[in-house]
UniProtKB/Swiss-Prot annotation:
Its cofactor is [4Fe-4S] cluster; [2Fe-2S] cluster. It comes from the Bacteria. Disulfide bonds: none annotated. It catalyses: (4R,5S)-dethiobiotin + (sulfur carrier)-SH + 2 reduced [2Fe-2S]-[ferredoxin] + 2 S-adenosyl-L-methionine = (sulfur carrier)-H + biotin + 2 5'-deoxyadenosine + 2 L-methionine + 2 oxidized [2Fe-2S]-[ferredoxin]. The keyword Ion transport does not apply. It holds the Pfam family BATS. Its EC number is 2.8.1.6. Keywords: 2Fe-2S, 4Fe-4S, Biotin biosynthesis, Iron, Iron-sulfur, Metal-binding, S-adenosyl-L-methionine, Transferase. This is Biotin synthase. Gene3D superfamilies: Aldolase class I (3.20.20.70). Belongs to the radical SAM superfamily. Biotin synthase family. GO terms for molecular function: 2 iron, 2 sulfur cluster binding; 4 iron, 4 sulfur cluster binding; biotin synthase activity; iron ion binding. GO terms for biological process: biotin biosynthetic process.
Amino acid sequence: MSVVVRHDWDRKELQALFDLPFPELLHRAASVHRAHFDPAQVQVSTLLSVKTGGCPEDCAYCPQAQRYDTGVSAQKLMETEEVVAKARQAKAAGASRFCMGAAWRSPKERDIPKVAAMIREVKAMGLETCATLGMLDAGQARALKDAGLDYYNHNLDTAPDYYDSIIHTRQYQDRLNTLEHVRDVGLKTCCGGIVGMGETREHRVGLLLALATLPAHPDSVPINQLVQVPGTPLHGTQQLDPFEFVRMIAVARIAMPKSMVRLSAGREAMSDELQALCFLAGANSIFYGEKLLTTGNPDTERDQALFQRLGLRPMQITVDAAEHDHPGTVHAEITRSAACEHAA
């Protein structure tokens, strides 16, 4: 099956995909997925909060916003040695990518060298590296790239016409500007959004339209299901229909056929059957480990058991650290399945 990568999608086309009968939509999405990926392989990442809480922004979904009483206290930036220890544990559990998140509006200049040191050390272990630190300027993006960062995550969160219902302290254009800085220095982009925040299907179409018409499709597209945290404004929002979540995955796969589509936040509350439908619809990446920043995530044993039941295996990668300013050269290939790592 030949699939053309397009950047000229229009709203009517994506809306028509969303409105297809569910079996037909899954068939189309699975066909596109198979044209570009091995459907039995899933990329496995681990996400660590290296700086938790105290964020000055007002994102209505976020327990790390200091203005909400969520029980999350502000903590200082972790030491590099602590981060390396967590990365070592993640690799032993089968992760191939290690993501570092900090609850900042944007990093201060004094923080960039500290994060760069974390990136260099994790990269030298043979892991892909990803960071999500808030808004970046061009110089900060360059510094992270020079440290060896592979991916930068900066989500659009929701559709442009629903954005003001969720966030007031950062403009949509601010997010687009950060993505531009990241692309300009050659970093891979990780960009998606959150569903289940009270938006309509039309808003979900709008989010995917914004993503699929970027100058370059994100290399990774995380689709998050809202995790409702007491104390945040969105706590108590009506739950999204699980089939609607699968539709979101399927249309993302069709619209961005070469991107990794990641099951991100909210997976802890998903049944194995729902996750299996998401993999069938084209999801091929998950976060692995008991926490996503400050919210829960399925434990590794559950994920390993699910992979075994579905016949899935972690995606193999090769990380070359020689292209960066590291002492020595690292060629690492993650080849053992998570189940084997657990058995060992």
